[in-house]
Regions:
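C-terminal and inter-domain tail/linker signature
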Residues: 1-142
Length: 142
C-alpha cells in the first residue's frame, strides 16, 4: 500500500472508527477544503469546521464503523469505497432518534500535500440513510 493509501486508511480508522478528534488536527492542512461535505452541499473549510460537522454527526450516530472495500492511489490522491454502519442515537436533520442500526455506502477521495489532507470529496448514499430512518418513503419503480 502506498503512503497516501495508508493515510486515507488511517483517517477513516482513527477519525471515524476510533473517534479520535486529535487525528483531525494531525492530518489536516489548516486550509483543507472538504467539497460539498457540509449541510446542503456547502464546503467544509479547515479542521475546526470539520470538527463541528464531525461532532454533530457523532452526536446523532453512535457505534460508527467503516469497512473499506477498495483502495486506489494515484499521484497525490487516494480513493476508497466504503460502507458505514451506525446506530441512530440522537437527533439528525430534524429526525428524532430511532435506535435503528443503519448502513450506507460511499466513496471518498483525499488529496495530500506534504503528508496532510488538503482537499477531500465524499459521496455517500444519503437517500438510503433517510429511507432507513423512515424519513422518506422507499422509492418505487413505476
Amino acid at each position: 500500500m502506498g503512503e497516501n493509501a495508508a493515510r486515507i486508511h488511517k483517517w477513516f480508522e482513527e477519525v471515524w472508527n476510533q473517534g479520535r478528534e486529535a487525528t483531525i488536527d494531525a492530518m489536516c492542512d489548516p486550509n483543507a477544503i472538504g467539497y460539498g461535505q457540509a449541510q446542503h452541499g456547502a464546503n467544509i473549510n479547515g479542521p475546526e469546521h470539520f470538527k463541528q460537522f464531525w461532532r454533530a454527526f457523532r452526536s446523532a450516530f453512535s457505534n460508527i464503523h467503516i469497512d473499506i472495500h477498495d483502495t486506489v492511489e494515484q499521484g497525490d490522491r487516494a480513493v476508497i469505497r466504503w460502507t458505514m454502519t451506525m446506530v441512530h442515537s440522537g437527533p439528525f436533520v430534524g429526525i428524532a432518534p430511532t435506535g435503528k442500526r443503519v448502513s450506507v455506502d460511499g466513496i471518498s477521495i483525499q488529496r495530500f500535500a506534504e503528508g496532510k489532507i488538503v482537499e477531500a470529496w465524499d459521496k455517500w448514499d444519503q437517500l438510503s440513510l433517510l429511507v432507513q430512518l423512515g424519513a422518506v418513503p422507499e422509492p418505487k419503480l413505476v
